[in-house]
């Protein structure tokens, strides 16, 4: 009987005795299990699936499960490596006292069983309890009505159990392999084996500088949102490589320069810090770089998702200035007058009235912008090149209807607003010459043109022409000039946009749309602010929830890496600080040295992460334009969200610094002996 209970009793005793390491390890396991279950629960929740615009949200949650699963694997293995490093001396002592490798392996299996079961049970319990709260929070963000009731996802429990059972078995297998490879003497001496002084790897440092600069240049030279979307992944990879190389090679070079400065180095608070970090910088560098990358991921994820969600209302107002928006393609069969008549008849049948009507005709077509800034019209040339610009034309009458500052143009004159390359004051458009009488400060369209964010044009030129005749003349000429050889692609598009407000219930608006749609003979687009609002909040609310969720996971990883690294460093430094105190270093000097080291280890990754965020600011702003249809507020609004996220993260970071410095000091400090003995 005693033989049966020996290993369980010893396993529990070991965990309790090493609670300083196993408690954070268990909390990590419980937190990741709970977070994975919550996302799995949301991915399969029937209540959420019953809402028509929730499909994308559940896809996001499913993708979040994958991210949490991958990150949990990395985090659990990372924390386990620190725990096992601290236990190597203990396991070696067991071997010296007579326990064979198979006995120690059995002990590790029992410990893994207890830890795994405890983590799964507590994690699932926490996940089940919090899942309803998370669902209510998600519904609040999505502007869905919150429903009462409680449910448990059997699929979520099964997925979580399978994933983390496999993960804990892999961790156990890794520990057993390490045990069988090591010799008892090596385990006993592992904690006292020092690191060789690393050499400065100039090639690695050069690679770091080159990749980091390349990533920053790439992030700050892109012009269009689609270009930012294409290059974002490559820029991230370059910055990650550069960060690891700079921390690994650059930190060693800096420490050696500090050591060469005799005035700085030979001070008690600097001597112990610099010498200790220099000999263990290979491990420190990777840890610092990991903290930096995780902090950057957290800051970018939270700031962008907060910006997207808080900018929904502004996006709706700028993209849809009226409640209902129709844009109809015009041709011989469908004129603007026909479109207006059709819409007004449909409105009359509803018993409501159209209010705040806004309408205009617009012509858009692609052109090739030459080096001399001439606009060339050639359909075949446009199809064979990627260097294409686009032109959007409206009339002076339409422009003056919805702008407070009217303009007056003569024949051959235009008002112009360009994004990208500017046009000359006198420019050629096909066989016509135009003079720019006035340069506008913003697009002449009455609402934000979201389409321009989805194009890869090198430039966009908005022109205001004197009258309808000029616009129609341009349309006829451009249509003829842009005809392709196969004549299958319509490049010039003449559209009529009719926007209005109508005070009607959602059901009436849907009926209105269904009755009106078949009456148009050409291509058209329809937008209703109420319906679009539901879709916006469903998408951006899901983004925000997942962003905050992953931000919490990244924060957990950051704090744990910092904690375990600093605790491990504290135990490694304990003997050295004990010797320094015995030869005369005061407790105050020990505290100053600890403060100096913790400051370096903590705030270097934070400062570097902030630099990374602002280095990527231009690219992220361009990416946001793909989703946040409000050009006037994108940059300033994202800056506000970024600064707010930075401030909040810095406060949490400072609290972690205080707690870690206090724990580190308790480990390395040696209490003075009582003089009475």
Question: Which role fits each region the language model picked out?
Answer:
Residues 1-33, 197-202, 211, 247-295, ...:
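N-terminal Sec/SRP start-transfer signal
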Residues 2-6, 181-195, 571-572, 665-677:
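Short cytosolic juxtamembrane segments of multi-pass membrane proteins
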Residues 20-47, 56-92, 113-126, 206, ...:
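Hydrophobic alpha-helical transmembrane segments of multi-pass inner-membrane transport and secretion
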Residues 41-55, 124-156, 213-230, 605-673:
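Short helix-loop junctions at transmembrane helix boundaries
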Residues 111-258:
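Hydrophobic alpha-helical segments
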Residues 150-151, 187-200, 270-278, 283, ...:
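Membrane-interface segments at loop-to-transmembrane junctions
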Residues 315-329, 334-556:
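Basic-flanked hydrophobic alpha-helices used for secretion and membrane insertion
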